Design a protein with these regions (language model features):
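Catalytic machinery of carbohydrate-active enzymes
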Residues: 1-353
Length: 353
């Protein structure tokens, strides 16, 4: 933090944080929002997000409001929102380099901040913005958010903030949570692996709860995983984000792939076993409750940071940062398909203590 560089704002400023990407990106913007709340306790802080990601901010104590926009707005909807936001905030911050979030930061804020790339369009944005951060890539997404706090001259508060937890009726005792069905095929572990893990967890005397999204493909995959497995209680498609946070906070252990639920589990303090394939954990690894003093390595059989165990099948191509071996969302990923149940169970056993 460079206090001499602190931006001058009113004592009770209005601040807008813009995060127009997927659920995980929105969650990873919460350390920036938390830093803003610590710096300006009396501020009004809102977030501009896509409507289908707003739930992950529900009950966030650092936010006063959420401005939700359609994931694919028409030109008319975009212009109407811009007119509605025009100069409504003392400070507007884009968490992305893209044209649309930067445009809304310029429109909404009397002062504006955004990351910019070293391109012609980036140089143009830098000239229009009041403050900017050079986007270089190659660092953890949370670190990118904290660099925006640095640019404002305020102290970092590197904590992911979960949705406000709410209890799930009828769930008690010792239980494990598995999240077998990510939204995209290329992040899936094998059905056989999940079945072996569920049976092992039940053998340890734990109730096994399966979570998942409402999508048809996710439901079908979980159908195949759970077929004939009476030990698994399914709550897929039935929980909102606060309920998920409440469920995860009291779980003995959570196991899941690179998905937003895994990031919530880590932030909630649950012993979390994350199964990573193509995704680079140096950029997108789970953020433990105590933060990351030592960043994740690119690849390894098992790494531990705080309450998170990160498991990989370290093939020579890992991490490729591609959408599976076929470079498409519905592709298989050999690194995950060939990840052995024995390796995952060893990490879960350690996480259970």
């Amino acid at each position: 933090m460079n206090a001499a560089n602190r931006i001058a704002l009113p004592e009770q400023p209005r601040i807008l944080v813009i995060a127009l990407r997927r659920l995980g990106d929105v969650l990873m913007a919460t350390p920036l929002i938390h830093s803003l709340r610590q710096a300006w306790p009396k501020a009004t802080i809102d977030a501009l997000v896509f409507a289908d990601t707003a739930g992950i901010l529900e009950g966030n104590p650092d936010l006063n409001g959420i401005v939700a926009m359609p994931p694919r707005p028409t030109a008319g909807q975009g212009l109407a929102l811009a007119a509605r936001l025009w100069r409504q905030y003392d400070l507007a911050i884009s968490t992305q380099c893209g044209d649309r979030p930067t445009f809304f930061a310029l429109v909404a804020g009397r002062s504006s901040l955004a990351p910019v790339e070293s391109t012609f369009s980036g140089r143009l944005k830098r000239a229009l913005l009041d403050r900017s951060v050079a986007y270089a890539g190659g660092v953890h997404r949370v670190e990118e958010m904290l660099q925006l706090a640095d640019a404002l001259g305020i102290a970092r508060a590197p904590r992911l903030v979960c949705p406000h937890p709410r209890a799930v009726e009828g769930v008690s005792g010792d239980y494990a949570v598995i999240h077998a069905a990510p939204m995209f095929r290329y992040k899936q572990w094998s059905k056989e692996g999940w079945r072996a893990l569920a049976a092992w967890l039940a053998g340890r005397g734990l109730a096994v709860i399966a979570t998942g999204g409402p999508g048809e493909a996710e439901r079908r995959y979980l159908d195949a995983v759970c077929n004939g497995l009476s030990v698994v209680r399914r709550l897929d498609g039935r929980l909102d984000w606060p309920q998920l946070a409440g469920l995860l906070a009291k779980a003995r252990v959570y196991v899941g792939p690179d998905t937003s639920v895994t990031h919530v589990a880590a932030a909630a303090g649950c012993p979390t076993v994350a199964l990573y394939g193509p995704t680079d954990p140096r950029l997108w690894g789970p953020w433990p409750t105590g933060g990351l003093d030592t960043m994740w390595d690119a690849a390894g059989t098992m790494q531990r940071r705080g309450n998170v165990w990160l498991v990989q099948n370290p093939l020579p191509c890992l991490p490729c940062q591609l959408e599976g071996c076929e470079r498409r969302l519905e592709s298989y990923s050999a690194c995950l398909d060939e990840l052995s149940p024995r390796q995952v169970i060893a990490a879960v056993e350690e996480a259970l203590g």
